[in-house]
Amino acid sequence: MNNINDNAAAAGSRPARRLNLVPLDERYGIGGKVIGVANAGPQVHVGISLADCRYHIHCLGPTGTGKTTLLARMILDDVEAGRGVAAFDPAKGDLIRDLLARLPKECGDRLVLIDPDEQQAPPAINLLDPAVHGGTAHDVAANLTAVMAKVWHRWWGHRTADICYHGLLTLAHLPGATLAQLPRLLSDGKWRAGRVNAVTSSLNAWEGNTLGEFWEGLNDLPAAQRSGLVAPLLSRLRLVLAHPMASSLFGVPATTFSFADILDGGVLLCRLPKGVIGEDGTRLVGSLLLAGLWQATTARARIAEDDRPDASIVLDECHNFLHLPIGIDDALAEARGLHTNFVLAHQYLGQLSGDMAEAIDANARNKVYFALAPRDAIDQSRHLRPYLDDGDLIRLGGYEVVLRPVAGGRIVPPVTADTEPPPPAEPGRATALRRAAREHTGLPLAERRRLLGETATGVGADDEALSGDELTQPPIEPPIEPHNFQPKGVDPERSPVTPQVTSHEAPREARRGDEHAGEHAPLHTTYAHVNDDEEDWWTGTD
């Protein structure tokens, strides 16, 4: 078998590239988000300033009232101004299609397109690479487990969390391992034994023993009982990863874009239609990508506030994706100071869980309402009194909104406005932008086959056991950069293709002085649990 170090080096033979971000001093535009034109009094544009957008925007309105049109205008304004924006579309995908036909052609070299229709050279990101998140293998396992716990909370419990966390932790210690290999790790005993042996023998004694004891305990269970314990996680994970879009995105030991680059001026368009990739696929893929953006947001704390460029994360049907490792209330509160604003759009309040609804109600202080159903109008009219009541919200016309904004950090009286239509579609623009995204942040199929074939831990690799020596690497410190901006006209290879990090994580944990690093417990993360009455661990029901 080839040495894993050689394989990792082969995967990293391509030079690192960056998205071609617009420098801060060259960014222009309205400096905020235009909502529409006032239809009472002087016909002037009304909107939210850039600083006040950091208080986040809650956009509520049933289907057919004009939400998608407004979201498209917001995103186009951000892109044209050179700001970073990530947009998630879980419905029919019309929002992303409309944007591709209208975005400026100059944004092609900072565009990342995640779309099931892209099959020639879709992007890739290895979520198990600690360098992608800027943390350790423990952080990777804890964050991904927390996301899955919230996405699948109805079928989740302590043992599922235990199995998921230790499986992800094992793979995160393996150079070239990917999320797509978690089902094989849990179901293929021979393949698992080689990988577990390699990882435990390469770690510090206390850490390797703790991880080894977990797998020994699982292996000692009767086969039927072991299968029952892993079945809930396996059945749902396989269902998602079986789709070509999910496997092409998360199943290759390479990364072609950076979440930090997106926030610093890139454009991430995620078209995740439920009718194509399934409801579980939409929720898990979108939530994992959002969690990556959240980790990049928290990393901005290392940058001086004046150097943090404003970025927007636009979530259509937001309830599908708000499964962050921390609470939504905490995330919205922290994101404001880190200059990342959320635009949270959905159709009616019943789509939100109780905690989610309270967090959005309190922390997304800019309110945009389209014509609402009576129940929602009664509830939300408390934000508008004494100026407007629930009847005013019910009687709004098509593409008409009530904006209750924040100005200078203070809530101001609401205004009514008519939203503006997006600019006309440009013939051939979508095709040109798809081609540009493919060239700058896509990974061709031939390259994917090479990476999977040359990486010792790749799917399809032989089952020969790995030795610990093959995993031991000199530690690599990820650089701490103040920002990701480059002047225009730099090297044309602009987007990152980062291979799986080959550094051993234990030395870095020792330097951090984390006394709990060897305990394999989630770091600063609480799992979502169900109670004992809601889960049958021993029959494997899911």
Language model regions located:
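Conserved H-loop
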Residues: A345-Q351
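Short, glycine/polar-rich helix-capping loops at beta-to-alpha or helix-loop-helix junctions
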Residues: L95, Q351-A359
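Conserved AAA+ ATPase "SRH/arginine-finger" region at the nucleotide-binding site
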Residues: D115, K367-R375
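N-terminal helicase ATP-binding lobe
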Residues: E80-R83, P386, T498, H524
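Conserved P-loop NTPase motor module
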Residues: M1-G36, W191-A198, G228-P232, V267, ...
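Conserved AAA+ ATPase core "coupling" helix
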Residues: D376-H383
